[in-house]
Swiss-Prot record:
It comes from Aspergillus fumigatus (strain ATCC MYA-4609 / CBS 101355 / FGSC A1100 / Af293). Its main location: cytoplasm. The keyword Amino-acid biosynthesis does not apply. Residues 249-329 are annotated as: Handle region. The active site is at 245 (glycyl thioester intermediate). This is Autophagy-related protein 3.
Length: 353
């Protein structure tokens, strides 16, 4: 049954009409050209990622150029298997990340599970959110602010140590380390990226496909992640794949939240009375308006600095229609939210170069 599903999925992608019209801002979907643009940005910013070709010309898809059929990063560590500490515990169920514009009665299928860490992690995250405050010019701490506050610079995030998720002290494990090769392909049917994972017990010993499910969170094993042949390789190489049916709606949610947060920042900058006050606004790192997986992302497009000028002057002249996340930054955000499916795999390792 799984073989039939994999075959049908492959042919559906290859036979679906190719969209050349950008609907990135309105639907969260991207065209093949935008996928290549986003892939080029990912490879440029994070050299652990690279473009790759299909194993043979017959395996290529016509809507992507030769040599840029998919993206790959190799040897990503996974130090621990997932258990109840990741999948949640009694009294603390996994949350659904909903579209910010939909009501409380929205169908759960319209959202994305926010998982990992159980009650303890959730409480710690809540405490961190409560600690976010503003400070006035006199140094007085203000009241807690509403969600969707400020967005950090994307260009400044590359060297931000706080953006890297690290193993908490005292939480070491004796479980054998696995490594994964991660592949990002383009789903022509859903018009979104799609992630495939191939695991290894050692550099020369592939991980049996069914054991990859030990590194997948809870309900995803049945609802979202399946074992399928990788369409770009000959020989039927079985991998775990995160189904893309909800990717567009989740990305649209993140885009909307980031834009709303950027608008709040821009409004605060307009009300700033000095460059120092503007710099304090820009230095704030609250990201409550986005899902936790996007913490530390660079979500603000920079226009560049005039000679002798500072960021205050540049941001004062931003266009009102400026967006928080450009289409070429799509895959960076995509990887941040997709990490919720496999929190044991150190996705940030791929962004540490």
């Amino acid at each position: 049954m799984n073989i039939l599903h994999s075959t049908l999925s492959t042919w559906r992608d290859r036979l679906a009409p190719v969209s050349r019209t950008s609907t990135f801002r309105t639907t969260g979907q991207i065209t093949p050209e935008e996928f290549v643009l986003a892939g080029d940005y990912l490879v440029y910013k994070f050299p652990t990622w690279s473009w790759a070709d299909a194993s043979s010309p017959a395996k290529r898809v016509s809507y992507l150029p030769p040599g840029k059929q998919f993206l790959v990063t190799r040897g990503v560590p996974c130090h621990r298997r997932l258990n109840e500490n990741f999948a949640g515990d009694a009294g603390h169920e996994d949350e659904i990340v909903r579209d910010m514009l939909s009501g409380a009665d929205a169908d759960d299928d319209d959202g994305w599970l926010r998982t990992g860490g159980g009650r303890d992690l959730a409480e710690k995250q809540a405490e961190r959110i409560k600690d976010v405050r503003t400070v006035d010019e006199s140094g007085n701490m203000g009241e807690q602010e509403d969600d969707e506050e400020d967005i950090p610079d994307m260009e400044d995030d590359d060297d931000d140590e706080e953006a890297i998720i690290r193993e908490p002290a005292g939480k070491s494990t004796t479980q054998p380390t696995r490594t994964y090769n991660l592949y990002i392909t383009y789903s022509n049917f859903y018009r979104t990226p799609r992630l495939y994972l191939s695991g290894y017990l050692s550099p020369s010993e592939p991980l049996p496909p069914h054991l990859m499910m030990e590194d997948i969170v809870g309900d995803y094993k049945d609802k979202t992640v399946t074992l399928e042949d990788f369409p770009w390789f000959d020989g039927g190489v079985k991998m775990a794949s995160v189904h893309p049916c909800r990717h567009a709606s989740v990305m649209k949610t993140l885009l909307d939240r980031a834009d709303a947060a950027l608008k709040i920042r821009r409004d605060k900058l307009k009300q700033a009375h000095s460059a120092d006050q503007a710099n304090r606004i820009n230095s704030e790192r609250g990201l409550e308006g986005l899902v936790d997986e996007t913490r530390g992302l660079s979500l603000n497009e920079q226009q560049g600095h005039a000679a002798g000028g500072d960021e205050w002057e540049v941001l004062q002249h931003d266009e009102e229609d400026q967006v928080a996340i450009r289409v070429d930054q799509y895959l960076v955000v995509f990887l941040k939210f997709i990490a919720s499916v496999t929190p044991g795999i150190e996705h940030d390792f791929t962004m540490g170069v």
